[in-house]
């Protein structure tokens, strides 16, 4: 969700990160937040669940979604003068009702 990811970028800002992009899109898909933590580029998926009837927010980032995020991230790196040796990680910000959980290194980028 556009508004959720823009507002949740503040979670990173409060931790001293620089938010590089919100709702970044390319031909491979979208990444909700791209931020920089020191030298590390953080690619973050935001998931929101109002109730647990469809499962918790963290459970919504399955293998196929991870692969898509990785493809978008690789293209981002390539088109921004970066390469595969650039330190990066994949995070998930999960919002269940009013509970916000930041899961750093939620999955590996080698899939």
Question: What residue spans do the PLM features occupy?
Answer:
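Single conserved hydrophobic/aromatic residue that forms the stacking wall/gate
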Residues: 1-9
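A short acidic/basic microdomain associated with nuclease active sites
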Residues: 13-27
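A generic beta-sheet turn/junction motif
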Residues: 26-28, 37-39, 96
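Structural motif
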Residues: 28, 41-43, 87, 100
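Conserved catalytic cores of phosphodiester-cleaving nucleases, focusing on short active-site segments
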Residues: 31-57, 69
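Mid-chain, well-packed structural core segment of small domains
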Residues: 53-82
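Domain-level recognition of nuclease-like catalytic cores that cleave nucleotide substrates
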Residues: 79-111
């Amino acid at each position: 969700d556009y508004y959720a990811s823009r507002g949740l970028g503040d979670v990173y800002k409060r931790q001293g990160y620089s938010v590089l992009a919100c709702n970044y899109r390319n031909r491979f898909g979208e990444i909700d937040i791209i931020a920089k933590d020191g030298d590390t580029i953080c690619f973050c998926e935001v998931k929101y669940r109002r109730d647990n009837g469809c499962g918790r927010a963290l459970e919504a980032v399955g293998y196929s979604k991870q692969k898509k995020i990785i493809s978008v991230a690789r293209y981002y790196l390539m088109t921004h003068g970066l390469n595969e040796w650039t330190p990066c990680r994949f995070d998930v910000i999960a919002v269940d009702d009013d509970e916000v959980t930041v899961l750093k290194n939620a999955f590996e980028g080698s899939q």
